[in-house]
UniProtKB/Swiss-Prot annotation:
Family: Belongs to the IspD/TarI cytidylyltransferase family. IspD subfamily.
Pathway: Isoprenoid biosynthesis; isopentenyl diphosphate biosynthesis via DXP pathway; isopentenyl diphosphate from 1-deoxy-D-xylulose 5-phosphate: step 2/6
Sites marked Transition state stabilizer: R20, K27
Subunit details: Homodimer.
Catalysed reactions listed for this entry: 2-C-methyl-D-erythritol 4-phosphate + CTP + H(+) = 4-CDP-2-C-methyl-D-erythritol + diphosphate
Catalytic activity, EC: 2.7.7.60
Keyword list, A-Z: Isoprene biosynthesis, Nucleotidyltransferase, Transferase
Molecular function as annotated in GO: 2-C-methyl-D-erythritol 4-phosphate cytidylyltransferase activity
Name of the gene this protein is made from: ispD
Site positions (Positions MEP for the nucleophilic attack): R157, K213
Protein name per its UniProtKB record: 2-C-methyl-D-erythritol 4-phosphate cytidylyltransferase
A Gene Ontology biological process term: isopentenyl diphosphate biosynthetic process, methylerythritol 4-phosphate pathway
UniProt-listed HAMAP family: IspD
Length: 236
């Protein structure tokens, strides 16, 4: 029998535009196969029986989401997002007062694997702080001279990880940390950085490197390849 972790909900911030994709359509609404990237991302969350509800934070005035079949799903709630990612996540958290633990997942990350998600959810039994999916850095890392493209030095990649999503935290702790970080003008690039700012140390849960975020045009074809491969493996 699969493990169950009660009181788990999810927030998907989907109010961004993604100008690096060089399209007029926000990247989360680009299609892979017969579904949008957003639909793939949310479907991966709902495939786990522990996830009771998903709140999607969209841009005010968004007319695309309501046209998706996802908009009618009984476990989906939509709210207006904010100017920044942290604002959208907070808006989603406010719509989930019943949640004990909350996953936050990128709208443009469609290739989440269920085994990774299950191992992340297991943190609710062993941690009071939570953690994130992450992948160890494998490439040689270079730091550039400030404002230039010349190499300043090589960065030791030992103990360096790529932060992925979902990220998974107790709801009240995440609300408190995001609120404090925003009020104090801290730079928050993901949810874990808000906890770090407040003195907490979330866990790193090793995840698959093919859990990519679609950011640039070439990422779309790569995500399609990974999703197609995953479907073939499930049928095998």
């Amino acid at each position: 029998m699969a493990a169950t972790f009660p009181g788990v909900c999810a927030v998907v911030p989907a109010a961004g535009f993604g100008r690096r994709m060089q399209t007029e359509c926000p990247k989360q609404y680009l299609s892979i196969g017969n579904k949008t990237i957003l639909e793939h991302a949310v479907a991966a969350l709902l495939a786990n029986a522990c996830v009771q509800r998903v709140v999607i934070a969209v841009s005010p005035g968004d007319r695309r989401f309501s046209q998706l079949p996802l908009a009618q799903h009984p476990q989906i709630t939509v709210v207006d997002g904010g100017a920044e990612r942290a604002d959208s996540v907070l808006a989603g958290l406010k719509a989930l007062p019943e949640a004990q633990w909350v996953l936050v997942h990128d709208a443009a990350r469609p290739c989440l694997h269920q085994d990774d998600l299950s191992r992340l959810l297991a943190l609710s039994e062993t941690s009071r702080v939570g953690g994130i999916l992450a992948a160890p850095v494998r490439d040689t890392m270079k730091r550039a001279e400030p404002g230039k493209t010349a190499i300043a030095h090589t960065v030791d990649r030992n103990d360096l990880w790529h932060a992925l999503t979902p990220q998974f935290f107790p709801r009240e702790l995440l609300v408190d940390c995001l609120t404090r970080a925003l009020n104090e003008g801290a730079t928050i690039t993901d949810e874990a950085s808000a906890l770090e700012y407040c003195g907490f140390h979330p866990q790193l849960v090793a995840g698959r490197a093919d859990n990519i975020k679609v950011t640039r045009p070439e990422d779309l074809a790569l995500a399609e390849f990974y999703l197609t491969r995953s479907r073939h493996q499930e049928k095998a």
